[in-house]
């Protein structure tokens, strides 16, 4: 009897980036094949070129329908978008053509999931400048998913080993982020990370909430957001039965979370969460002056479908050199499978 394995759609990311490389390397592994049935969404010619660069012994099966996939060893099933002119294809190039291709790949993988043709989605890195050059005015994957799934309440969760970070706001200016520190928004974010932790196997998650200002304002010396918005949100969350503490200064919250005191961290803005997260998940090779390995997964919460992603960028400077690490892509696929397998724990949205 064959063991059930979910079908996972993987958008390859920007065709000029390391996205195709990390995608091909990941789906070629036994680790990925053992847990799911992957379908790559992207341009088949770019992926064929990538296979040749990596030297992997793989063949491409071009498909236009999910039921045409073979899911066989040595075969990469590719939902061929035919959206890149391979004769003019250049690695590391920022362009409207590649931005449009990346955008189309993402929209297609969303469409397949919304139609229940695949069980989860994983995304490779896109270049925000290229996307916008193509006329698609989105600040990132998260906003594209929200638009094409008609989702109003959503959040970004970063996961790396025992560090789990969720943001009250993400792709807005720092000035706007301060304005978004509101009681109701913080409560919603606490609820989202509590549910997400339970879905990845943490039965009674303990949540730490960061302050916004230095030292969490030290009783109002450095700002009012803690007293007016964050503390009331925490009190309300406690009333609702959530195990939550705060506000905690970031430089205290993260060492404790890494040490296992907190199962999840709620932060107020993008860099407050991304900087410590990437310090933990990214490994810089001092001798070679390049990233040695990159781990970490981005999970979009609140969507009607599952979406995980690598938490690294396009790395245009090393695209096409066969030196990009597939670790984060493998981890993203593993989390997509894990979330799919715990759908019964889902309340509303992921």
Can you describe what each PLM-predicted range is?
Residues 1-141, 184-208, 212-268, 272-297, ...:
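Contiguous, glycine/small-aliphatic-enriched amphipathic segments in soluble metabolic enzymes
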Residues 170-177, 321:
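Amphipathic alpha-helix from the class-I
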Residues 139-166, 170-173:
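Flexible loop/hinge segments that line or gate small-molecule binding clefts
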Residues 143-152, 174-196:
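Active-site glycine-rich loop that binds ribose-phosphate moieties when present
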Residues 158, 298-300:
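Well-ordered beta-strand positions
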